Design a protein with these regions (language model features):
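Histidine-dependent nucleotide/RNA phosphoesterase domain, centered on the 2H-phosphoesterase fold
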Residues: 1-179
Length: 179
């Protein structure tokens, strides 16, 4: 099964504001469905069920307090002239708390062979761009600063992802609550 560790966005006001940004962005790209909005803390990839059970055991010992998140800006990977992903970033305090949580998760799962190939950068993907050579510098500049409602992260999830022609279908394999 294809799996990852994530924290989800559930605040309807935030989700609707993101959908508005997506519709105002005016680019030929695949928008992320608002029901699939999340921060991927660690991508695990294809794992067998017995490994998922080991992951669940380790995740159950992750401890974190609720995290207040304010969305503050739009960014692009790798850059606005050759974009692949358009994302929304968060304030510095939330960013550090999400980084700390991602590090804690990785530390718990490293003995099982899971390690990120790059440092975690908190971002909420809102578009995936397939066609190359689309310069979206002006769009990014227009949405350089955003101020959406606050989201409070209270759950960490082990998620399964099933890829379909209509986009991924996510399901929860485990939920760890903030303490």
């Amino acid at each position: 099964m294809r799996t990852f560790i994530a924290v989800e966005i559930k605040n309807e006001e935030v989700l609707n504001a993101i959908v508005k940004i997506q519709s105002d962005f005016k680019i030929k790209a695949t928008p992320v469905n608002k029901r699939n909005m999340h921060f991927t803390l660690l991508f695990l990839g294809e794992i067998p069920e017995y490994t998922a059970d080991k992951v669940k055991k380790e995740l159950s010992s992750v401890s974190f307090k609720p995290i207040d998140v304010r969305f503050t800006h739009v960014g692009v990977f790798p850059n606005p002239r050759f974009p692949r992903v358009v994302w929304i970033g968060v304030d510095e305090l939330a960013s550090q708390k999400l980084i700390d949580l991602a590090c804690q998760v990785e530390k718990k799962l490293e003995p099982l062979g899971f390690k990120s190939d790059r440092p975690f950068k908190p971002h909420l993907t809102i578009f995936r761009i397939k066609n190359k050579g689309v310069d979206i510098s002006q769009n990014v500049e227009k949405f350089k600063a955003v101020d959406l409602s606050k989201e409070v992260i209270t759950e960490l999830k082990l998620k399964q992802s099933i890829l379909t022609p209509n986009g991924p279908i996510y399901s929860d394999l485990q939920v760890v609550l903030a303490k």
